[in-house]
Design a protein with these regions (language model features):
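An alpha-helical support segment within catalytic cores of ATP-dependent transferases
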Residues: 1-62, 72-73, 114, 155-163
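Alpha-helix boundary/interfacial micro-motifs
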Residues: 16, 79, 99-101
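Helix-rich C-terminal or lid/interface subdomains of diverse kinases
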Residues: 22, 52-55, 85-88, 96-168
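Pre-DFG segment of protein kinase catalytic domains
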Residues: 58, 79-82
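Acidic active-site catalytic centers that drive phospho-/nucleotidyl reactions
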Residues: 62, 82, 94
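Hydrophobic residue at the +6 position relative to the catalytic HRD Asp in the kinase catalytic loop
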Residues: 66-68
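Active-site beta-strand-loop-beta-strand hairpin of nuclease catalytic cores
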Residues: 70-78
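Acidic donor-binding loop at a coil-to-helix junction in glycosyltransferase catalytic cores
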Residues: 91
Length: 168
C-alpha cells in the first residue's frame, strides 16, 4: 500500500523508539557488565544510522510470533492479527520482529521479500535495528518490575543476535 495514499486516509507514523540517550541511561545499566560495552557500541552505531535507504512503507511493524496463527502440524502460517502497531515507517524495520521467533525465520522472510520485490535489504541494518529495538523496549519498561525480566531477556537475545551477525 503506497505510504502517501495511506497517509491520506489517516495512517500515522509508527511509534518512535526510545532515543539512544535513553537507551544508554535506562537500559545499559541493567545489562550484565559483560554486555555493556558491546551494547554501547551498538547504540553508538544505531545513533549514526542514516535514514532507511529504501524509504518508508505502510507496514505491520509487529510481526512476531504472538501475533501469528500457525498450523504447526502443516508447518504453515494461517494468519496474522493485532494491527494496532501498523503504520508508516522505515522499510528495514518491518523485518526485525520475526527475530522474536527465530533468526532463521527472519532470514527466510528477507530472502523471500528480495525475490518477490527485486530489492536488496541490508542484513546488517536489520540486525542493528533488532538489537536497538530490544534495548529501546528495555529502556521504556526499565521502571516496571513485572516486565523487567522479559525485557532484559529480550535485550540480551537481541545483543546475542547482533553478535552472531558480526555487530557486537
Amino acid at each position: 500500500l503506497p505510504p502517501a495514499r495511506m497517509r491520506a486516509v489517516g495512517a500515522l507514523p509508527v511509534r518512535p523508539w526510545e532515543s539512544p540517550a535513553a537507551m544508554r541511561r535506562r537500559a545499559l545499566p541493567l545489562l550484565p557488565a559483560a554486555w555493556r560495552e558491546r551494547a554501547e557500541r551498538l547504540v553508538r552505531e544505531y545513533a549514526k544510522l542514516p535514514a532507511d535507504p529504501l524509504g518508508s512503507i505502510f507496514g505491520f511493524f509487529d510481526g512476531h510470533g504472538w501475533n501469528m496463527a500457525f498450523d504447526s502440524e502443516a508447518g504453515r502460517l494461517n494468519g496474522v492479527y493485532d494491527f494496532a502497531d501498523a503504520g508508516i515507517g522505515p522499510l528495514h524495520q518491518e523485518f526485525i520482529y520475526s527475530a522474536f521467533i527465530d533468526a532463521d525465520l527472519t532470514e527466510r522472510i528477507v530472502a523471500a521479500y528480495e525475490r518477490f520485490s527485486g530489492r536488496r535489504l541490508e542484513r546488517r541494518r536489520i540486525a542493528l535495528l533488532t538489537a536497538a529495538h530490544r534495548l529501546s523496549e528495555l529502556a521504556e519498561l526499565a521502571d516496571e518490575p513485572r516486565h523487567l525480566p522479559e525485557m532484559l531477556a529480550g535485550a540480551l537475545d537481541g545483543l546475542a543476535l547482533a553478535e552472531a551477525q558480526g555487530l557486537a
